[in-house]
Amino acid sequence: MIFAKGHGTQNDFVLLPDVAARLSLTAAQVAALCDRRRGLGADGILRVTTADAAVAAGVLHRLPDGVSPGDWYMDYRNADGSTAQMCGNGVRVFAHYLRASGLETRDEFVVGSLAGPRPVTVHHADQTHADVTVDMGKANKLGPGEAVVGGRRLSGVAVDVGNPHLACLDPGLTPEQLAALDVGAPVSFDHAQFPEGVNVEVLTARAAGVVCMRVHERGVGETRSCGTGTVAAAVAALASAGQETGTLTVRIPGGDVTVNITDATSLLRGPSVLVASGEISEEWWRDQRR
């Protein structure tokens, strides 16, 4: 069983090319593969398939709204084995892999997800590096919320980016204080407001068009980056200045991305790196089913 390993601003993934969607992919197998000691190690799994194949194989019960049968489909799983609606960094890496592997030759195409279609533009791609913009769709502000992160109580803005986020901007937080915050510890939030959990971003006030951010992803813990989280952070940073639209650089531990919030949509541009490829032992894979 072949695989590739890649990352988008150090949010890392194992890619499993499975165009016909024939691969068994249990929660236990995903968790084992993502384990950094007994598996390959990753923040998540990206199964590379098509929307019609995913439906035919029962991976999807039906096509997500706006996704066409012939679209590529990113079957994304969190490191704990749960299914996730969207991952902006994952879409960039997914699109990069399609180009690098020769499965796709176009510069512009659509990647389907549980959250709907995500059009991508590949500005550059070689076997190792790529620069990709993802149309993330409209990010919707849902209202205020609160979280406790690393013992610090924070107020934030709930944002739907195809998955739930609580982006907490603390105007008194310096980049140095943000770096020292224990974002990896369990976070507290209102479970009535977020019954399926929430991704929590902590960010500084913007300075010279840049905001610094760290994120605790549901089902994973702290990651070096979160694409949808950077969009939520940009929405919150703009809102704090009384703005609905604008372009910001979001600086996460894994690097910088550019987020453009418009009236109609949100655009996420950033790098992708393909690190390795190889084969997973079939015997090991079978042993992880239980």
Curated annotation (Swiss-Prot):
Biological process terms in GO annotation: lysine biosynthetic process via diaminopimelate
Keyword Iron: no
Assigned EC number: 5.1.1.7
Pathway: Amino-acid biosynthesis; L-lysine biosynthesis via DAP pathway; DL-2,6-diaminopimelate from LL-2,6-diaminopimelate: step 1/1
Main location: cytoplasm
Residues binding substrate, per UniProt: 11, 78, 88-89, 163, 199, 217-218, 227-228
Active site annotation, chain numbering: 87, 226
One GO CC annotation: cytosol
Domain of life, source organism: Bacteria
Alphabetical list of PROSITE patterns matching this protein: DAP_EPIMERASE
Record's subcellular location: Cytoplasm
Alphabetized UniProt keyword annotations: Amino-acid biosynthesis, Cytoplasm, Isomerase, Lysine biosynthesis
InterPro entries reported in the protein's UniProt record: DAP_epimerase_AS, DAP_epimerase_DapF
Gene Ontology MF annotations: diaminopimelate epimerase activity
Site (Could be important to modulate the pK values of the two catalytic cysteine residues): 165, 217
Catalysed reactions, as listed in the record: (2S,6S)-2,6-diaminopimelate = meso-2,6-diaminopimelate
Family under the similarity heading: Belongs to the diaminopimelate epimerase family.
PANTHER family to which the protein is assigned, alphabetical: DIAMINOPIMELATE EPIMERASE (PTHR31689:SF0), DIAMINOPIMELATE EPIMERASE, CHLOROPLASTIC (PTHR31689)
Purpose: Catalyzes the stereoinversion of LL-2,6-diaminopimelate (L,L-DAP) to meso-diaminopimelate (meso-DAP), a precursor of L-lysine and an essential component of the bacterial peptidoglycan.
Subunit note: Homodimer.
UniProt name for this protein: Diaminopimelate epimerase
Taxonomic source organism: Mycobacterium ulcerans (strain Agy99)
Source species taxonomy: Bacteria, Bacillati, Actinomycetota, Actinomycetes, Mycobacteriales
